[in-house]
Amino acid sequence: MANKEYPLAKFRNIGIMAHIDAGKTTATERILFYTGKTHKIGETHEGGATMDWMEQEQERGITITSAATTCFWKDHQVNIIDTPGHVDFTVEVERSLRVLDGAVTILDAKSGVEPQTETVWRQADNYKVPRMVFINKMDKLGADFLMSVGTLRERLHANAVPLQLPIGAEDAFSGIIDLVKNDAVIYKDDLGTVMDETEIPEDMKEMAEEYRTMLLEAVAEVDEDIMMKYLEGEEISVEEIKTALRKGVLANKIVPVLCGSAYKNKGVQLLLDAIIEFMPSPLDIEDVKGTEPTTGEEMTRPADAKAPLAALAFKIATDPFIGKLAFTRIYSGTMKNGTYVFNSNKGKRERIGRLMKMHANHREEVEELKAGDLGAIIGLKDTTTGDTLCDDADPIILENMEFPEPVIDVSIEPKTKAGQEKMGIALAKLAEEDPTFRTYTNQETGQTIIAGMGELHLEIIVDRLIREFKVECNVGQPQVAYKETVRKHVKAEGKFVRQSGGRGQYGHCWIEMMPTEGEYEFENAIVGGSIPKEYIPAIDNGIQEASQSGIIAGYPVINFKVKLFDGSYHDVDSSEMAFKIAGSMAFKNAMSKADAVLLEPSMKVEVVVPEEYMGDVIGDINSRRGRIEGMTPRAGAEVIRAFVPLSEMFGYATTLRSKTQGRGNYVMQFDHYEEVPKSIQDKVIGERK
């Protein structure tokens, strides 16, 4: 079965995404069970789920890394990426979306759209990924299908169109009405493999009629032929509805909504059918865009195995037995075992050792990967996340991925002297796998600092150090990852001259430094050769190294641009080293004049509390320097949305529990960096000294 060749039109590359605990991994497990990939269904709460293969995931019952799996259903090849729902791991979601063609969002029928669903949905909007929604846990207490559909419209502004209605809810959930075919499916056994297709139950006919009309109106909006038929009262066939639905989904105009209970095995096969019917194949999406490495001109590559190779390494993982795996999406062309590919980001040729198709943590070796495939490559030494692999005769650089800055850091030290080197190697490997995890040495204290997206993120990193790399370490208290930036446009000089017998050192440069919104930029505006070309990168390096430790409190400096406009050199004494030091001196001089300020991470916080505690909770948020953005009622509770500095949120869970007698809960995620008030800045500087 697995070795059969599938045409591209029969490929589906989809992601499964959701808020934590909406039942995403369970749904993926059921899909693998029905498509014949696993013989025993894994349960998350037993710690046996196939997709969750890192030990930490099985213990915590959450998904941390997105596993990529290939399975087969009704003569189609479906590649599934299971993405984490915890806010600390948005990077995994971001990179999965970059390589998917479509996504299934899973909601908990009791809660509808939750904050992390919104985050993931916005990320999917950025990549224009067509989506469908599976409302899960219909068997749970408080399950409400129509409320959940309502939250899709209100909170995500999605054109949510139910294709199904549940028959019963909670314990009485027994089947599903199919509005497209206008019939019903009743489940007869616990495994969901025995089901009866019957007529719609009498007591639901009226409701089904009403929702089928809404479905027809939605497809008529995207298809003129159906619009004409609908207005003239003609019968519209099931095939016509499906064709129009597919068209609406691909254009991001319709979001089909299905329902079920993955845990009770209800609705999963219908979900698989819908993935095949409505999700895009690699041929349906736009040709992938990129740039020519030398000229920078825009190019595109079609989804065609005969076209030149263009592939994106979207995730690096380290396997204890085979070393480094590069998970890759092939957009065009073919990649063969044992051949060379060109990494256009690094400008290096790399040899492919072996090619794999992945099934959670089992692998199948293959001879080649073609356009549309998702697979893993073994043997690439220099490739990191976001790199493009192509033919050196036909180079292209695909659009890279952008990752957020880490917001929280802790100091870490090995328990033994011997562990120091081991820890350094392990941290470098982990940083290579995860672009939102950074590690650096604090220049003032000499401590090793690790930084990430949240406490859970760093906990899991430390856990992996102990388990995978056998490094025992002591970890400090979590600290806020402050940053520094500049507010003024200034000019500054850096001059490094040393004459002390023998060959001297000479480096001299003038720079302009200015604030920007985006990443660090370096512009070389030298004319007339006042500094030779070969020394320019050294100045850039000197500035970048110096920017790791700002002048206010030694935090990394962000959001600035440097323009190198003048300088001088010495025929004999100038060297790269001298210019690197001159660059760092110019940076420090510029910073001291540029009105430097401290920045802190501001978090987007959502608190759900019963109405009677609202006053207390809002008062507490204000006392934490929070800015209330708005409030919305939700089923007997209020949702308070606010921006609060991360430094004020440590220990918030305990406070919220005591203020609401355990009935309040909250989620937060990083939103942006903003300036720290002067009084707080002085306090932070005092604590650093």
UniProtKB/Swiss-Prot annotation:
List the PROSITE patterns hit by this protein, alphabetically: G_TR_1, G_TR_2
Q: What CDD domains does the record point to?
A: EF-G, EFG_III, EFG_mtEFG1_IV, EFG_mtEFG_C, EFG_mtEFG_II
Query: What's a single GO BP term from this record?
Result: ribosome disassembly
**Which residues hold GTP?**
18-25, 82-86, 136-139
Identify the residues that the record assigns to the tr-type G domain, covering every copy.
9-283
Under the heading Pfam families, the entry gives: EF-G_D2, EFG_C, EFG_III, EFG_IV, GTP_EFTU
Record's subcellular location: Cytoplasm
One cellular component term from this protein's GO annotations in UniProt: cytoplasm
| InterPro entries registered for this protein in UniProt | EF-G-like_DII, EFG_II, EFG_III, EFG_III/V, EFG_IV, EFG_V, EFG_V-like, G_TR_CS
Give any GO molecular function from the UniProt entry.
GTP binding
Tell me which UniProt keywords the record has, alphabetically: Cytoplasm, Elongation factor, GTP-binding, Nucleotide-binding, Protein biosynthesis
Report whether Iron shows up as a keyword of the record.
Answer: no
The principal localisation class reads cytoplasm
Q: Which family does the record assign?
A: Belongs to the TRAFAC class translation factor GTPase superfamily. Classic translation factor GTPase family. EF-G/EF-2 subfamily.
Q: What does this protein do?
A: Catalyzes the GTP-dependent ribosomal translocation step during translation elongation. During this step, the ribosome changes from the pre-translocational (PRE) to the post-translocational (POST) state as the newly formed A-site-bound peptidyl-tRNA and P-site-bound deacylated tRNA move to the P and E sites, respectively. Catalyzes the coordinated movement of the two tRNA molecules, the mRNA and conformational changes in the ribosome.
Report what the protein is called: Elongation factor G
Biological source species: Clostridium botulinum (strain 657 / Type Ba4)
Task: Give the classification, highest ranks.
Answer: Bacteria, Bacillati, Bacillota, Clostridia, Eubacteriales
Its gene name is fusA
